[in-house]
Amino acid sequence: MFLSLLETCIRSRNLVLGQVIHQHLLKRSLTLSSSTVLVNLTRLYASCNEVELARHVFDEIPHPRINPIAWDLMIRAYASNDFAEKALDLYYKMLNSGVRPTKYTYPFVLKACAGLRAIDDGKLIHSHVNCSDFATDMYVCTALVDFYAKCGELEMAIKVFDEMPKRDMVAWNAMISGFSLHCCLTDVIGLFLDMRRIDGLSPNLSTIVGMFPALGRAGALREGKAVHGYCTRMGFSNDLVVKTGILDVYAKSKCIIYARRVFDLDFKKNEVTWSAMIGGYVENEMIKEAGEVFFQMLVNDNVAMVTPVAIGLILMGCARFGDLSGGRCVHCYAVKAGFILDLTVQNTIISFYAKYGSLCDAFRQFSEIGLKDVISYNSLITGCVVNCRPEESFRLFHEMRTSGIRPDITTLLGVLTACSHLAALGHGSSCHGYCVVHGYAVNTSICNALMDMYTKCGKLDVAKRVFDTMHKRDIVSWNTMLFGFGIHGLGKEALSLFNSMQETGVNPDEVTLLAILSACSHSGLVDEGKQLFNSMSRGDFNVIPRIDHYNCMTDLLARAGYLDEAYDFVNKMPFEPDIRVLGTLLSACWTYKNAELGNEVSKKMQSLGETTESLVLLSNTYSAAERWEDAARIRMIQKKRGLLKTPGYSWVDV
């Protein structure tokens, strides 16, 4: 009787009645003698998401090694309730206890691995699958596809998917959602078309929802409209998740009018819909409209839709557009509404003040957080670097490690950037060691930051060693190394690397060409620089020269002493020269004691607005040419107008 009642409670997820039955069983001492009863109680608590109670009952099961069902239930409960580490630990304990996993064990432990991005553990479990009777099981193989796709191991996901003897809708959707998470839009569209062509399956609601991340991140308006049309034809467009997804795609595709039209349709919106509309306005630099939507949430019956995400988005908009008073108002609302106790909101407020430049407020908010996490520290470390307080980031980095909080990639990137700003080789080398020990040294972004740090600390050989040992290079990797060769005066090495880059099939971008022009300038490679700029102007690299490229060419000519040619180059620019271009030329006039040309350039600079830089450079140019009266006259003008040079200081670690 009790077993049938328990079965009813499990099916209806009636926790209260189930606990009453459990109490009766305890009073009659029936639970200790029956593993069947204990397994069903574990099922009850697991189905009701009462994970701790489920584990307590699970631990009472006698001879658990003969009953794999209980292990499966417990692993599933952990994996489904964000206790991924415990699910993985229990799986290994299951193996050590001599219990053979079933086909229901693997999908949930792989789900835990995907949540933890535990690639090594997942690959080990894959080997266990291959040694079991479930290597071709569709349910298990789909879980493997989902694991590899979510972890970014897309080639392995394709391999497992292609080797599946039979694929259902769930397997196709796992591929689509996994590739979509990594913004592989072309692959997502291809899979969407192939599922019908190859296996005769029509995309369902889950397929469409899985496509939205790739469509949104790519800003794919044309494809987004096509998917919207498909949803309308198939009757999916009335689904709330689909409406919100389409809204988000339009907003991220810079088509905010269409996004607003979807938002204004008569349907019951949830908190995700409101947040998507606010985020769309913020992303499209329409902070006023974002504020209006946020206010609309507060004054109508939608106040329950206000979430930490919505508060974070509106604060992000205030930070981006320098609206300190608006951000403070949102901060006050968060305090009054009780959101200030939410760690996500607290971290967002720190990030807002840090991005705005109000580090005092950021530190004050940081000090008020009781239990800080890695995001709390990351927000402040990044803020310190951005606001020219890089030395503070070292203290915070040390503090978080002593507090038992493990730094992540964002932390390390912030600290390495601080090391670059200060040329702090000691701190940078220590951070490099931490990256190696904890497995971050294979990350492309970390390697790029390490190269930048070593380059600016004068250790070009170490930077090159990092570059040579990288598993995967992106365009930033090449650009960083090119800039490194350039600032160290190794123009020929930079040109050689540039050629190697093209030979490997990597197309240069505007930053690449800026780096190679800068390298030519610092090495006096005038002819090579001219040839490169002419190729760029002809469109050989599909990059249009911008003001920075013209500034580099001006510096190249002026630094080599071709002042008249540089001046002629500046006058023939397709747009008005800015203060940087003219400052570069004026600095060269000082170096080569060309007071006449310096005077002409100074007049152009002053037409853009008088600056301390232009007057100081002109005064120095006159002094270098021994025109002391003119130099004194410029100094007097500078003094009368209050354009005084601010004394500065700098330091490096030795």
Curated annotation (Swiss-Prot):
Pfam families: E_motif, PPR, PPR_2. Residues 581-654 are annotated as: Type E motif. GO terms for biological process: RNA modification. Keywords: Repeat. InterPro entries: E_motif, Pentatricopeptide_rpt, PPR_At4g14850-like_plant, TPR-like_helical_dom_sf. The keyword GTP-binding does not apply. GO terms for molecular function: RNA binding. PPR repeats lie at residues 1-32, 34-64, 67-101, 102-136, 137-171, 172-203, 204-238, 239-269, 270-304, 307-341, 342-372, 373-407, 408-442, 443-473, 474-508, 509-543, 546-576. Belongs to the PPR family. PCMP-E subfamily. This is Pentatricopeptide repeat-containing protein At3g16610.
